[in-house]
A protein has these predicted regions:
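A short, charged, Gly/Pro-tolerant segment at domain boundaries
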Residues: 296-303
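C-terminal helical cap(s) of enzyme catalytic domains, especially alpha/beta-barrels
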Residues: 55-64, 200-214, 256, 268-293
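Short donor-sugar binding/catalytic loops of nucleotide-sugar-dependent glycosyltransferases
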Residues: 246
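Short gly/pro/ser/thr-enriched loop/turn and capping motifs at secondary-structure boundaries
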Residues: 48-53, 132-134, 196-199, 270-272
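Alpha/beta enzyme core
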Residues: 104-241, 250-260, 265
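N-terminal capping/small domains of soluble enzymes
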Residues: 1-97, 102-104
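Short acidic/polar active-site loop segments enriched in Thr and Asp
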Residues: 39-40, 45, 95, 122-125, ...
């Protein structure tokens, strides 16, 4: 059997599969279905300085080959995440976990990251500058190289753990933003978050989502996400975590050939809670089929 392990910023993962933030809760919920220690790691629910109740309902709309969501970063706030959620997580997950942090000001990001950084179970901090669902924050940082850089510099001053910046695809030039984050000190880049989309209820003649618009994800976005991962990984020297419409072991191999060191799986978890388990179990078959002896060796292998 081929070697599935990869090294992400100094930490060895048994495999490159990472459930994406917002699709896997705080992990322990999924441990009732299967042993989540088979995962490379996972990115837990997006955490903010203060508790957030999220957007009004309805928050989810189905689409052909995908879905739109506008949950709005619902979470109990960083203090409760540390005091209540992480203890439940560490009882069942015995590897380093990826924290996911959002904010509505540079100070918010720094405050939350500084607190999360002190937790032993956290191996990486994924700084989400790309959430498209919250008015006045999140997305505005990720659509400007200057604003994204400012967040990265502030977070790097107060943390010791690797910082991975999660980018929005809803920009004119994602490569410019990735390079700006690298220059500001980011240790890695993850991309892409969801694409901004909407659906209209023909009977009511109103948007299906109460927030009007939300993040479109699912298999339909995979080719666009793959292209962006390829472009960014060829433009920066830091590791890239690829995501966007990944739903099979073949998709994972494509992402890695495009330049991803590890691969996040998002919407597929909402369709099938066993999605990541199935992908991990199928990887050896796909590796054998395409004569891949080591996943680490194929990173960026597409010319």
């Amino acid at each position: 059997m081929g070697k599935m392990s990869v090294n992400l910023l100094g930490i060895e993962l048994d495999n490159p599969i990472i459930p994406a933030s917002g699709t896997f809760g705080f992990g322990y919920e999924f441990n009732e279905l299967y042993d989540i220690n088979i995962l490379g790691t996972f990115s837990f629910k997006g955490t903010t300085k203060d508790p957030r109740f999220g957007n009004p309902t309805p928050r989810i709309a189905e689409c052909p080959n995908g879905m739109i969501n506008a949950v709005g970063l619902q979470n109990p706030g960083v203090d409760k995440v540390i005091s209540e959620e992480l203890p439940k997580l560490t009882k069942v997950f015995h590897k380093k976990v990826m924290a996911n942090v959002s904010g509505f000001s540079v100070e918010d990001y720094a405050y939350t990251c500084e607190k999360i950084d002190k937790e032993d179970c956290v191996g990486w901090i994924e700084v989400n500058v790309s959430c498209p669902n919250v008015h006045g924050g999140g997305m505005s940082f990720g659509t400007s190289p200057e604003a994204a850089s400012e967040v990265v510099r502030a977070v790097k001053k107060v943390t010791t753990k690797p910082i991975i910046v999660k980018l929005s695809p809803n920009v004119t030039d994602i490569v410019a933003i990735a390079k700006a984050c690298e220059e500001a000190g980011a240790d890695g880049i993850s991309l892409v978050n969801t694409f901004l989309g909407m659906r209209i209820d023909l009977n009511k003649k109103r948007p299906v989502i109460a927030n009007k618009m939300g993040g479109f994800s699912g298999p339909a976005i995979f080719p666009i996400a793959l292209r962006m991962v390829y472009q960014v990984s060829h433009a920066v020297k830091i590791p890239v975590v690829g995501m966007g419409g990944v739903s099979s072991a073949e998709d994972v191999i494509e992402m890695m050939l495009a330049g991803a060191t590890a691969v996040e799986v998002g919407a597929a978890n909402l369709v099938d809670p066993f999605a990541c388990k199935k992908i991990i179990e199928d990887l050896p078959r796909v590796m054998e089929k395409y004569k891949i002896e080591s996943l680490q060796s194929i990173i960026g292998g597409c010319e």
